[in-house]
């Protein structure tokens, strides 16, 4: 067996490459029945016109003389050099096919296996100047070559990509990384993928999403027949050469208890009490992680929380990000993405609910009460986590690479986030140690393990750890929604989020208004206002029931098309009326009133931006009329513009109006009244 490649195949950077390079480790795995040859040439390019063509190296000639029965080719990394790809990209496919032809001439029966390129990390000095894009283009060309030549295709990229510490110099895998590559080749050659494997989220009491195709998937040894039975439904399939298999059942109606059985060879997994209903993911930071026993309603509601139709999947961290130093064992686990505890689906009961997210529980309970079908809630929130930690690596690499660089000293990331992370990993020596707050980390440790488990939508409560830079958050939040919708292959997946509450932090007025505008800019999103439930001194207000239920209102109105108001009054526009009066119009206004029965409070107007004065406010039907003797020509209006606000405008359902800031125009607008 010939391993054809460059310095990665050769084992550059590995202290004992004769023992730990990927070909050497592969030899150990395969045993004496195989002879593995390492024909890696550091710096080699696939391109004949590259700066060091593999065709011209002694390693190429040695590989031809080896007359391999199997050849694994991993070339193309060095072709990302600006001397190569920009000039000779049109020759890549033909040059690769020529290399394959050469191996086939040496042995017409040779089994050719092409490898998708291993990752190049963002720390590479040329990453943002072209290397990242060219790396992707070469990946696509390798897939084309595999199709044309009829060669097998394996993946060196996916298993290394979430583990940047395996690439100490951003390019060459260390011994552990080389071992992962060897295992990929070993499994491809032998078909041994360790037998039947299913996603960890498949357990007893799981809930499958109703009214959409139900896909069951996993791993098995190559070629093995996999049989899947869901209730009375049955399908079988065969695991492909990469060990992957899946079956898809037609959409099913809600069902309270069925059985899922998956078997392959002598292995069988049986999952009992499987329900079919509605599945939602609840995520974010500490206010979503905030547990029921901490909530103001705990003593009343926990004893009554037993519900066989409400199923919970609680992903709790192994280590909270308290103000402590973690030991080396913890740091090693973090590097290997072992941050969350093992979990399993459970039916709601007082013992389970007491430690479950309060917001997620009330969200799920209201959906279950309203829809009268089983509801499954997955919660993976992590206290203190910033938005960027929840976004996939490729999205940040291609659309916000600056946030990845030197993240512990990166001004895009909130100082408190960086300081807490630095404290937790203080015992680490050298670079490369990861932390839950690091960009991408929680996507890789908390989203990827879900393995695209079908969810109806997302309920999100986060933002406190990004309120220092509103403009950056506006970019990051859009990337987050795009990232998750792409991951679940659902471009219109509902994404409902909580606006930050009231707290005595000066940037929060602007942040709340930014969140309001984000809802208007991103399709299929909705925002639950919580400013009326805040605590001036506590970032974790205890009144969570209304927040969870406000999120559920959005889902019921917007996703399930129930006839109810999704939210409180949302600013539509403001215009000048006679004299110095301003009329403010709202969407979702219903019957405007105040939460306390007192005069409307919280409006300000200004002639010059930045010089606002309190306005007398009067409700007239669907409008609020404003006036101030100190403002002769009003041009700007704002509402609830205090970090801790006592603004009191609500609609007919008692739902509060959002903080907003806007310009005063000369013409009225049409509001949406629901």
Enumerate the predicted regions with their spans.
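Conserved SGNH/GDSL esterase-like catalytic core that processes O-acyl groups on lipids
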Residues: 2, 8-97, 133, 247, ...
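Low-complexity, Pro/Ser/Thr- and charge-rich linker/hinge segments at domain boundaries
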Residues: 199, 206-209, 274-292, 301-304, ...
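Alpha-helical cap/lid subdomain in secreted, periplasmic
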Residues: 28, 54-195, 366, 439-531, ...
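N-terminal structural subdomain of ketosynthase/condensing enzymes
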Residues: 296-346
